[in-house]
Structure formats: structure tokens, C-alpha cells
């Protein structure tokens, strides 16, 4: 690493944000499989896009088709998966975008690692706090059924732990709130902190 140096860009992060007339941030959706991470993140992405904001959504399954296709689901691979994703999120935010990421990200230390990449107030942890029973009853990919049958090992919530965020910026329970209600809560949070404009 001693022969590698950091090159500053001529166009700054602040200038890129000003050009887009918005403030960059990362909304980090975390929770069990089936808790609504991708659903709510996608709905928020649409809502922000319709308001004219420049956004990008990174989804756990999609990232494993390319950037992280060489990784499995061991604890070490999960850590590396989140490390890579965190660095990519930072690059998107440096480009002035509002970034959303939807990853189980079960370990507190990994989420803390990503938080440290961002200036204060720009990392927004969104804990999808749906009960395991709700997530398992949805089971959109049939993964819980396979995990219960022993066909999938290291499945979060079944035989691998999920460390619940102690102080997330936002907590949403999709067993109690609709998609629209969740999006409204997220929009309100962003407006209150002047990350987006109030209507």
C-alpha cells in the first residue's frame, strides 16, 4: 500500500451536491429477510425520483450478482460484503447522490464500520423491525422454509444471529405500517433534517 496515494478530485463533493441541488446521505435499511427492506427502499427511491432528486439504490441480492459474486454467507464473507457495499455507498454519496442500501447486515460492528465512512448526520440507519413470525410468514423467496428444513445454513434469524440496532435513526414495523406510511415517515425525517426540501 505504500506506493498507493490518494488523488483529490478537482470537482469537490460539495460542488457535486450543489450541482444537483441536494444534500447527499445514505439510508441504510437493515433487518431480517422479509422485513420489507427492499420493498420500502424501492418505494422511497420512486418517491424521491418523482420529486426530482438524484438517487441510487443498492440491493443485497443484486450486489451479489456482480460486486460481491465471489462471497458466500460465512461471517467473514458477510463482513466483506458490507465493507465493499459501504465503500460503494460512500462513492455514490461523494457524487452528491441520496443513496439507499437494503442489506440484512446482521452485525452491529459492520453497520458501525459503514457509519464511520460518513460525516455526522449523513448515515441514517433504518431498522426494519418486523417480527420474525411476520418475516417468516411472508417468505417471498422460500428461504425460511429451506432454512427450517436444514437446506440453508447460516440463515439470519434461524441459525445465525441478527444484532438488533440499539439506536437506529428510524425504526419501521411493516407488520403495523403500510408501504405508503413507511415512505411518508422517511420523507418526513429527511425534510425535518433539511436533507430534502419540504413541499
Swiss-Prot record:
UniProt binding sites for ATP? 31-38
Record's function text: Catalyzes the synthesis of activated sulfate.
Q: Which InterPro entries match?
A: APS_kinase, P-loop_NTPase
In its UniProt entry, the species of origin is given as Marinobacter nauticus (strain ATCC 700491 / DSM 11845 / VT8) (Marinobacter aquaeolei)
At the top level, the lineage of the source is Bacteria
- EC annotation from Swiss-Prot or TrEMBL: 2.7.1.25
Family as reported in the entry's similarity comment: Belongs to the APS kinase family.
Quick check: keyword Kinase in the entry?
A: yes
Q: Does the keyword Nucleotide-binding apply?
A: yes
Spell out the Pfam families in the cross-references.
APS_kinase (PF01583)
| Reactions catalysed, as given in the entry | adenosine 5'-phosphosulfate + ATP = 3'-phosphoadenylyl sulfate + ADP + H(+)
Q: Which UniProt keywords apply?
A: ATP-binding, Kinase, Nucleotide-binding, Phosphoprotein, Transferase
- Active site per UniProt: 105
Name a single GO biological process: hydrogen sulfide biosynthetic process
GO molecular function terms listed in the Swiss-Prot or TrEMBL record: adenylylsulfate kinase activity; ATP binding
Question: Which EC class heads this enzyme's classification?
Answer: transferase
Pathway named in the protein's UniProt entry: Sulfur metabolism; hydrogen sulfide biosynthesis; sulfite from sulfate: step 2/3
Query: What protein am I looking at?
Result: Adenylyl-sulfate kinase
- Report the HAMAP family cross-referenced here: Adenylyl_sulf_kinase (MF_00065)
Amino acid at each position: 500500500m505504500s506506493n498507493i496515494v490518494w488523488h483529490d478530485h478537482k470537482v469537490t463533493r460539495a460542488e457535486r451536491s450543489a450541482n444537483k441541488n441536494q444534500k447527499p446521505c445514505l439510508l441504510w435499511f437493515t433487518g431480517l429477510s422479509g422485513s420489507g427492506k427492499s420493498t420500502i427502499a424501492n418505494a422511497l427511491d420512486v418517491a424521491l425520483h418523482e420529486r426530482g432528486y438524484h438517487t441510487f439504490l443498492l440491493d443485497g441480492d443484486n450486489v451479489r450478482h456482480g460486486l460481491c459474486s465471489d462471497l458466500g454467507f460465512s461471517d467473514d464473507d458477510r463482513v466483506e460484503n458490507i465493507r465493499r457495499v459501504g465503500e460503494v455507498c460512500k462513492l455514490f454519496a461523494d457524487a452528491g447522490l441520496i443513496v439507499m442500501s437494503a442489506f440484512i447486515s446482521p452485525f452491529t460492528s459492520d453497520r458501525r464500520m459503514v457509519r464511520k465512512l460518513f460525516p455526522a448526520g449523513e448515515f441514517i440507519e433504518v431498522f426494519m423491525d418486523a417480527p420474525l413470525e411476520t418475516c417468516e410468514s411472508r417468505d417471498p423467496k422460500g428461504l425460511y422454509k429451506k432454512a427450517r428444513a436444514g437446506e440453508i445454513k447460516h440463515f439470519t434469524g434461524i441459525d445465525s444471529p441478527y444484532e438488533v440496532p440499539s439506536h437506529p435513526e428510524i425504526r419501521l414495523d411493516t407488520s403495523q405500517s403500510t408501504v405508503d406510511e413507511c415512505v411518508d415517515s422517511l420523507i418526513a425525517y429527511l425534510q425535518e433534517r433539511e436533507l430534502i426540501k419540504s413541499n
